[in-house]
Amino acid sequence: MKVYFTASIVGKKHHLGDYLKIIETLKSKNCEVISDHIINSSESQIRMETREERLKFHRQLEKWIRESDFMVAETTFPSISVGYEISLAQHLLKPILILYSTGSPPSLLAHHKDEKLVCEKYSSDILSDLIDDFINYVKGTNDSRFTFFITAKIASFLEKVSKSEKIPKSVYLRKLIEQDMQYKR
């Protein structure tokens, strides 16, 4: 599968290790990752580009997103450019995994009602499982995506279990259901 990866170029000085971990995790799952435009670019390079160079790059960026199977955006460091790329991917109906490692989820995206947009807090312990779940969703190997509302008390419990067992909340819930299915056969 072809994946378009994006993240803040300015935030790279603080989060490069996280960016590389995400890219390597995607590659380990046999994904072709488009990421050089983030990893190999600098703020000063971008400022030095001419208008024509910026327009040419923008056309290339649109092509990469259009040709990708899905997008992964690391959004811990806020970026209007990353937000624009996410909006473009949404317009093209691409599945998008928004990742953030600290703080709150991106406020304009986390509460957006779009089943193709998934926003997850991650750590290196659960990153691989989160990406596996998302790839399975994109491939359609999951029967369906099921979204439901839970109380704050349940959300708090899920967060605690997720951290202590170092697994995504969705994996924990799936295991509970699978155990119950076996018990009730």
Predicted regions and their residues:
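Short acidic-hydrophobic, aromatic-tinged amphipathic segments that line or gate anion-handling sites
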Residues: 115-130
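Catalytic donor nucleotide-activated moiety binding site of glycosyltransferases and closely related
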Residues: 23-52
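Short Lys/Arg-rich basic patches
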Residues: 134-154, 159-163
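Short, glycine/polar-rich helix-capping loops at beta-to-alpha or helix-loop-helix junctions
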Residues: 102-111
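Short, basic amphipathic alpha-helical segments that act as recognition/interaction helices
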Residues: 165-185
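Conserved TIR/SEFIR loop-to-helix hotspot centered on a Trp-containing motif
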Residues: 77-88
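A short helix->loop->beta-strand "cap" motif at the edges of active sites that frequently abuts
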Residues: 92-96
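TIR-domain catalytic/interaction hotspot
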Residues: 44-70, 81
